[in-house]
């Protein structure tokens, strides 16, 4: 290839390049970066991260040597021309993180994807002292760390189908997604899938302790609880995906009248297990609403 042709090719690559900025480089951002890089290898993507913690920045650079790290907000200029910006800081740090970046022009054209808990699309615009921004709000969960997330997505009225597809492709790189029609549903998603892994871990803890109390050592009890939960979840997924049994039908198939499973489930039912789960989810939803005020 001649020098002029090479220059033209480089310019075209730069024009077609998807330029992504992460503001914040914590665990969820790390999971997303890893998923995007692993699943979008054929695409021309450049990822930069603004991370003020030197420890976190060094960890990110070691894990992903191909990304660019900014340690200070004033290192970022309009020349960077980001077209997708992930907000990935703690809620209490968002206003301070955005304040020095308000003056930059790319906010008006970029797709903003926020994984900041409790921060509405309107609040984000207020922090940026701007209006009519394209914002997709996301509630992922920690299984994103192994590309098994369940994420709820809401797009404000300024987001067109092209940008919705872009957000969908990026978030699908770390798991499953569900589009929401109402921003208030983010609070419900937070209660079910956002906090849901903790409910599963709590049940695993309880099952492990029950096994230990029956004479199994710690590692044996851990294996029994974990493989039982994993196997049951995969069996349920197989059935749901193939249109066979639902959760209730699967439970009923394990439960013989007058048998051991029936005896255990009877204790759950008598102690209002389903009601307890619902109350716990409602408490999480209400707390999410409060954090968003």
Give the predicted meaning of each segment.
Residues 2, 226, 230-293:
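NAD(P)-dependent Rossmann-like dehydrogenase/reductase catalytic/cofactor-binding core
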Residues 136, 185-191, 247-252:
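Short pre-catalytic strand/loop immediately N-terminal to key active-site residues, enriched for Gly-Thr
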Residues 1-75, 79-80, 148-149, 212-213:
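NAD(P)+-binding Rossmann beta1-loop-alpha1 motif at the extreme N-terminus of oxidoreductases
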Residues 123-134, 150-188, 201-241:
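Internal alpha-helical scaffold of NAD(P)-dependent oxidoreductase catalytic cores
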Residues 47, 57, 217-225, 250:
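Small-residue helix-packing motif on alpha-helices
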Residues 30, 34-38, 62, 99, ...:
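Short, well-ordered alpha-helices that flank and scaffold nucleotide-derived cofactor binding pockets
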Residues 60-64, 73-153:
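Rossmann-like NAD(P)(H) cofactor-binding subdomain of soluble oxidoreductases
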């Amino acid at each position: 290839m001649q020098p002029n042709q090479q220059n033209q090719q480089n310019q075209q690559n730069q024009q077609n390049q998807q330029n992504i900025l992460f503001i914040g480089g914590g665990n969820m951002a790390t999971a997303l970066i890893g998923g995007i890089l692993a699943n979008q290898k054929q695409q021309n993507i450049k990822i930069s991260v603004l991370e003020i913690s030197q420890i976190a920045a060094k960890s990110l650079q070691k894990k992903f040597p191909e990304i660019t790290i900014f340690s200070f907000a004033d290192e970022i200029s309009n020349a960077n021309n980001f077209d997708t910006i992930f907000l990935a800081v703690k809620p209490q740090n968002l206003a301070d993180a955005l304040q020095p970046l308000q003056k930059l022009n790319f906010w008006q054209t970029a797709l903003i994807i926020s994984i900041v808990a409790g921060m509405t699309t309107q609040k984000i615009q207020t922090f940026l002292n701007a209006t009519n921004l394209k914002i997709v709000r996301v509630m992922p969960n920690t299984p994103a760390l192994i590309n098994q997330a369940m994420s709820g997505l809401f797009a404000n009225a300024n987001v067109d189908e092209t940008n919705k597809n872009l957000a969908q492709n990026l978030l699908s790189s770390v798991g499953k997604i569900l589009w929401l029609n109402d921003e208030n549903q983010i609070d419900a998603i937070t209660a079910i899938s956002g906090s849901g892994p903790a409910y599963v871990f709590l049940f695993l803890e309880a099952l492990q302790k029950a096994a230990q109390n029956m004479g199994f050592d710690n590692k044996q009890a851990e294996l029994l609880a974990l493989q039982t939960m994993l196997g049951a979840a995969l069996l349920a997924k197989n059935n749901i995906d193939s249109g066979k049994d639902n959760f209730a039908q699967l439970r009923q198939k394990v439960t013989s009248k007058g048998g051991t499973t029936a005896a255990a489930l009877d204790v759950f039912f008598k102690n209002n297990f389903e009601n307890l789960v619902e109350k716990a989810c409602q408490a999480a939803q209400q707390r999410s609403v409060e954090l968003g005020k």
